[in-house]
Curated annotation (Swiss-Prot):
Pfam family, one: Tetraspanin
Cytoplasmic side: 1-8, 64-74, 254-270
Keyword field: Membrane, Transmembrane, Transmembrane helix
Family according to the record: Belongs to the tetraspanin (TM4SF) family.
Membrane topology type: Multi-pass membrane protein
Function: May be involved in the regulation of cell differentiation.
GO cellular component terms listed in the entry, alphabetical order: membrane
Cellular localisation: Membrane
Transmembrane segments: 9-29, 43-63, 75-95, 233-253
Extracellular face residues: 30-42, 96-232
Organism lineage: Eukaryota, Viridiplantae, Streptophyta, Embryophyta, Tracheophyta
GO biological process, alphabetically ordered: auxin-activated signaling pathway
Identification of the protein by name: Tetraspanin-2
Length: 270
């Protein structure tokens, strides 16, 4: 019985440690400029990480103090949390699978088409009901102004692969419009305005830029997709470890109960 409880305590400690990368991934996502504006996807992972931390601590105390009730609560709650984490992972994978990016000849960065992203993201993140608020939030960030500090010449800008999807979509006009580069957020004399409806929406007003463009909406979704795919990799590894820990903990708990039953039987209590 003591050996089984000690094993369960160690496993709960491991589960508790697993909550750290989950919470850290959520905080990292929430700290990004785009996620600061998109409240819908902001905190689910953080909340799950904190709940796993609390439940794992409960299980650790239950195993350390030989409290079967706490262990039973731990096993029940952890099963629910692992299930919820799997739902979040599968959901995030499905809605971020479509990729609206495309390469532009002579450019180190990609550009983005809104049509290439999932319908769920388009309908729930960048729909007309939400975009006014998102646009104002993005305009208040340092996403576009910092480009003028990082890139001086056109060659530097055009060859860079470090420009984020959000910057590519919101801070400059689409390449097809044929605007001439002055600086990363100032473009003049377009040669092909009919190439894209966004060509007419571009403004050199630094509070406007291409925030009203479909390319900006696509860039925002491109950023979300890129960040969630990175976070998903960490979460997948963590959830595999959590499932492994949970299965062993269930087995140890069941064996401990069986040993306790046999011990009572031998003592004539049953």
């Amino acid at each position: 019985m003591a050996l089984a409880n000690n094993l369960t305590a160690i496993l709960n400690l491991l589960a508790l440690l697993c909550s750290i990368p989950i919470t850290a991934s959520g905080i990292w996502l929430a700290s990004k400029p785009d996620n600061e504006c998109v409240n819908l996807l902001r905190w689910p992972v953080v909340v799950l990480g904190v709940l796993i931390l609390v439940v794992s601590a409960t299980g650790f105390i239950g195993a350390y103090k030989y409290k079967e009730t706490l262990l039973a609560v731990y096993l029940c709650c952890m099963a629910i949390l692992i299930g919820l984490l799997l739902v979040v992972l599968i959901f995030a994978f499905v809605v971020t699978r479509p990729d609206g990016s495309y390469r532009v000849p002579g450019r180190g960065y990609k550009e983005y088409r809104l049509e290439g992203f999932s319908n769920w993201l388009k309908e729930n993140v960048v729909d007309s009901k939400n975009w006014g608020r998102l646009r104002a939030c993005l305009a208040d960030t340092n996403v576009c102004p910092k480009l003028n500090q990082e890139f001086i010449t056109a060659d530097q800008f055009f060859s860079s692969s470090k420009i984020t999807p959000l910057q590519s979509g919101c801070c400059k006009p689409p390449t097809a419009c044929g605007y001439n580069f002055v600086n990363p957020t100032l473009w003049l004399n377009p040669t092909n305005m009919a190439a894209d409806a966004d060509c007419y929406l571009w403004s050199n007003d630094q509070s406007q830029l291409c925030y009203n463009c479909n390319s900006c909406k696509a860039g925002l979704l491109g950023n979300l997709r890129k960040e969630w795919r990175k976070a998903n990799l960490i979460l997948i590894i963590t959830v595999v470890v959590l499932i492994w820990v949970y299965v062993i903990a269930c087995s140890a708990f069941r064996n401990a109960q069986t040993e306790d039953l046999f011990r009572k039987y031998k003592q004539g209590w049953v």
